[in-house]
């Protein structure tokens, strides 16, 4: 995990070259914003653990992140999705697999927000350890510090 964090910080530092300070950036998702999206497939008998983590993470986000202003992290979007996993995602009548799908998405205007988020998150050791364990156990895809490539501007 430390190697992932170091790689992410390196990418963020490189990506920040020539960017406006956070105070001069409009708080709107646009091409070039940076974000996270992590997808989990969780057996139905383990969803209580994931739900507890989501509650803890949302509380962390509300306590430490901002929706506007100059102080990072300024989160442009934070959302969590939850749905039963269907045998055929395009056919709601296909039945369920016995798993629940979760998607966690966060978007920041630039690398400063992502970096501030990572720093604050790692300071909450129990929450971060639970995220690492859940990710190692249930994560099927993750975009970390990825640029937005299309947005409704």
Regions found by a protein language model. Name each.
Residues 7-13:
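Bacterial N-terminal signal peptides
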Residues 1-4:
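Positively charged n-region of N-terminal signal peptides that target proteins for export
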Residues 17-103, 109-119, 134-153:
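Short S/T/G/P-rich N-terminal loop/turn motif that feeds into the first structured element of a domain
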């Amino acid at each position: 995990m430390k190697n992932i964090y170091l790689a992410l910080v390196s990418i963020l530092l490189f990506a920040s070259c020539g960017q406006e300070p956070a105070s001069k950036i409009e708080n709107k998702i646009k091409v070039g914003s940076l974000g996270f999206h992590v997808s989990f497939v969780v057996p139905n008998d383990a969803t209580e653990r994931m739900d507890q983590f989501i509650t803890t993470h949302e509380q962390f986000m509300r306590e430490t992140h901002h929706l506007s202003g100059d102080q990072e992290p300024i989160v442009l979007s934070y959302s969590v999705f939850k749905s039963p996993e269907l045998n055929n995602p395009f056919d709601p009548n296909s039945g369920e697999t016995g798993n629940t799908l979760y998607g966690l998405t966060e978007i920041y205007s630039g690398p400063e927000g992502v970096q501030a988020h990572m720093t604050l998150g790692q300071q909450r050791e129990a929450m971060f350890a639970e995220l690492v364990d859940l990710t190692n156990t249930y994560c099927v895809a993750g975009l970390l510090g990825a640029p937005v490539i299309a947005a409704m501007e």
